[in-house]
Amino acid sequence: MLPFVTFYGKNLLELSPEDRSHEGIFLSFQYPVEIPGVSMVNFMRAAVNEQRKYKGLPALTASEFLKLMREKRAVVELDNKLANRSVNEGFSGGEKKRNEIFQMAMLEPRLSILDETDSGLDIDALRIVAIFLKLPKITPSGNPDLGSA
């Protein structure tokens, strides 16, 4: 028998990383990579619209996307200057982690796998991450999932 990992009825081991993302899995890294020349705005718009396309939803217009981005940026208190720069380029460790939490907020995954989320964060960033991770999520059954201790 071949190994399998079932997530919402699908064997994750048979899916590409891209399809795992489409299924709602978010993976953060201990050391997020820099992507020179790719702005956060373009990166996130492509990611969000790919998720929407996979779900059979229309792409967000530029104004809809920018509104969503402003809302999520406010939740994680991401500086507008960071959102307009290349992905993680020249960011401090804490800025990279905050940026990952922003990406997670934008993509609204079903499952987030976080690697040393508190690594390199200052006290303000730790507070934001803690608040964000404690926000109730809604499960497919419609019940709030308050997470575990």
Task: Enumerate the predicted regions with their spans.
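Walker B catalytic motif
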Residues: 113-117, 124
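ABC ATPase NBD Q-loop/coupling interface
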Residues: 4-20, 88
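Conserved catalytic loops of ABC-family nucleotide-binding domains
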Residues: 108, 128-149
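ABC-family P-loop ATPase nucleotide-binding domains
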Residues: 33-111
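Extended, folded domain segments that form the structural surfaces/walls around functional sites
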Residues: 1-10, 39, 130
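ABC nucleotide-binding domain signature
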Residues: 21-30, 142-144
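Catalytic "switch" loops of ABC-type ATPases
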Residues: 30-35, 148-149
